Amino acid sequence: MQEKSCVFMGAIPTGALFFMRLENAFLLSNKGDIIEIISQYDNLENDLIAWCRFKGENFQKKFSLKNNNSTYFAYVMQKQSPTKFTKFNPDSTLSPIHQGLAPNGSSIELASPKYHFPLNNKNEIWGNNLEQIYEESKKMQWNATTDILWSEIPSLDSTLEFATAQIMTYLTENEFSALYIPSRFLAQISPFFTPIPLVLSSIIGDEGRHIESFIKRANATGLGVQYSTLTTQQSLYSLWNEKDYFKSSFLLHVMGEGTFIDLLRFLEKCFENLGDLQTAKLLNLARRDETRHVAYGMNHIKSTISQNPSKIAILKDAVFKRKNYLESQNDESSLLLESMAILAGGSETKISSGFESVLELKKKMEKNRTKRLMECGIDEDLARDLSRSHTPNFM
């Protein structure tokens, strides 16, 4: 359908500004459209005819316009050159090859550079409630320096302090994993799917804040971070080494961080019982963030499975492949479990009762993992098998 646009030049003489506006009027028009220039000058016809010939456009006519006591002149031209911009297609499941770094909704000029975004299929990366998750991430921001009253952290006995520092070391390692993995995939997702890079950027910001906070807590009473065990290193390496976004999102956000929020809640209660309310608050704030990350992962996996149920087999393969790798290495981090048992018991003398609490936590983790997997669209029997096959190192 032919459209008409009008550019009011008024007293602008022919020159750089005049022809810039004229160029833009033609640039944004489609082939066959009419462009009308309104000017107070009546001697532009020859210049515009010459410009149209040079540009491959068509000058049609000139006529006068009278408005009260003023006289203006209209110069009518038609665009003969090809349309320069593609029309935005909101229903496309594939990002346009020329999308570049333009946001969703943009019309892209033809012949723009081709960026290679490997993750360019909506059916494989999308999830519901992305905007809501992103909005919540902005509302729930907190400051690790000012929102935690570090001076109010109590002094615990040396055994509890070591257990705390060791646990914070472990938490920090896990958060580095949760920082780097989304960062790797962020640059692979086309801006055509604008909400996803925004959500991932919020996740990355959250993880950076958690890393800062856990290190500060380890340093709060002078011990600092402690030991990084081979078991933890290998478990996180098997997570970090996954190069497929769908598998990685499942292993990290659903299986890993889903288990992690149960761990954070357990630790939060431990510190509440010890009277360390600021550390409990820190863990609560981190858990609140992690809950959003799990929601994103579950929405992503659920959406993808609903589009293609056969992808459940891919997730099954990823879980058992990781399980087989870890079984050939070490099992659990005994140093972490002992630290958790001491913390849960409240002292080294009550480590036995604390260890029972840790065992109950592991049962709860397995039950909650199974529930999350079923919510993603996986049948109960397989969900239970996958949950039981998850790394005993929590993440």
Identify the function of each model-found stretch:
Residues M1-S29:
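An N-terminal amphipathic alpha-helical segment
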Residues C52, L171-L179, L200-A218, H253-L264, ...:
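Alpha-helical transition-metal enzyme core signature, strongest for iron centers
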Residues N58-S81:
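C-terminal edge-of-domain segments
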